[in-house]
């Protein structure tokens, strides 16, 4: 595709700051979601810092030739939860996260060494475009439910208590369940999300050069402004349906001890290694085995997603990243970057499809933009009001952004198979299996290890391709 800024281009200083901010906004929602889901002492600020560190390591390993941001990996959510299973202390759990990320990164390093000696020819045969294309599409389509779920949801919540009768113990018992439900109307949230999406699309399609480069910033600001106006009116008139933005996050971040202090403006993130070092005395072989089993198999599957992301990015920038800088370097960058990032944030990192989509939609593939975004994430993590602002962006606004991002990932995957001959039954079956398995939500669970629909669909696609290729070869011989 036609790029406004190529990989080696350097935007002007003012532009660079704005472009970097846009990349940050594209990846931050998912990056901070992982620590919020896991809890146990993990914080969004530390995850932001770790993502920045991991991205810089990746850029250095790839010789500044691959424009993609590394963020917290959702594939390892089950693995991370296993690190805290069994009632272990927070300190031991943090150490487990770091050890797990090291093991996952080590898997990448080992594969990189193998690729260094045997090349990538085998990989292209195992995962041709007819396999990678629909897999990339599934990466986007599998996130569609998240985008739509967020699109109709505000962030202001209230506690609701529900009662149910349980007979599990043999005698009827009343079970009390407390949950947080949105106060705002789903229709008001939908309006804010659609305003965001509309502004993104209009800026990207009809905007002049500058607007076309920053559609997500303009879209998020427009959606946030609309949501804030609704919320202010809702607070003044006491109309719960209009309350979308949760402004209380500013006080929870900035007034931690109930008063204004230095932490109101600047604070040190809770780095994982600080707590992890305190867990060394509890670490034993049994716990190591638990972490090994939880992380290593998942890393093997995520490797395939790594290849898919880089083939997708290669098609966007019109340069084969698996050849130059080479799969060895991208794997080393991803693996070592993930280890470095987890030391600070606790979360293994991975190349982000949102970042790739941002590159494609804006036409800005400048690596210096990604580098600046990484530095920005690290700086943001220390500035309390900025962390609070990012956390206050309503789900519906990010849902509008994600429709564009996830949709573009899906479409770019489908574009990768446009040259494949789908009149050939072999190719038709490979694509069909991957799409239906992925969209259908096929997951495979082995103990504490869960293979996502993307991983399961990719594995089925590879097996189908290998099986039918062999059959076709045998038929040709006969």
Model-derived features with residue positions:
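Short, Lys/Arg-rich, polar N-terminal cytosolic tail immediately upstream
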Residues: 1-13
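Membrane-embedded helical hairpins/re-entrant loop segments and their flanking transmembrane helices
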Residues: 11-13, 37-57, 294-367
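Hydrophobic, membrane-embedded alpha-helices of multi-pass small-molecule transporters
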Residues: 14-30, 184-197, 214, 261-309, ...
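Flexible hinge motifs at transmembrane-helix junctions and intramembrane kinks/re-entrant loops
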Residues: 40-43, 185, 199-273, 293-308, ...
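Hydrophobic alpha-helical bundle architecture
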Residues: 41, 59-66, 336-344, 350-447
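Inter-helical loop and helix-membrane interface segments of multi-pass membrane transporters/permeases
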Residues: 82-95, 121, 141-208, 236-282, ...
